[in-house]
Amino acid sequence: MTATANDSRTLQFLGNNEITVLVSGSESGGKFSVMELVVQPRGGANALHTDHWVEVFHVIDGEAEWTLERDGSLDTWIARRGDTVVVPAGAKHRFAGAGDRPCRMITLGPPEYEQFFRALADAWQGPFDRERTPRAVGPVFERFGMRMVAA
């Protein structure tokens, strides 16, 4: 299988963050999706949330602040170039660009993962807003079996 680039592969989400589909769910025969995220400083998935699939993130440039539930408690740290973060299904997590330049990560998940980001890009075009963004993207989270949660 060889994936080729085209304009519909790059999406804007939660402001000026970008995700580029490298291998779509259909290109993998419905097995997985691979994407590149470009997360702006303090941008990203700022709301603590859970989902029902495993996600893998590999930092290829920059830094991201991660919060991830491990053994029932929340750990927060900075992931840097070369670090890989594995988010177990059902674990509370969030991430945001850290530092003063964008963070680039390769991420792997199921085909629904790509579909979620496409729906998220359609639902919210502006920067993250603590009051309005959750209301706008809440139905997208519900559709994909995800939940925004408290710490």
Where are these regions (language model features)?
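A short glycine-rich, His/Asp/Glu-containing loop-to-beta-strand
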Residues: R9-L48, W53-V54
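Short histidine-centered beta-strand/loop micro-motifs
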Residues: V23-S24, G44-D51, L68, D75-I78, ...
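Glycine- and acidic-residue-biased ligand/ion/polar-headgroup-sensing regions
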Residues: H52-E65, E69-R70, R81
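Short acidic-glycine-tyrosine-enriched beta hairpin
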Residues: R70-K92
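Ligand-binding loop in jelly-roll beta-barrel domains
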Residues: R81, A89-E114
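Acidic/histidine-enriched, glycine/proline-rich intrinsically disordered or flexible terminal extensions
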Residues: A119-A151
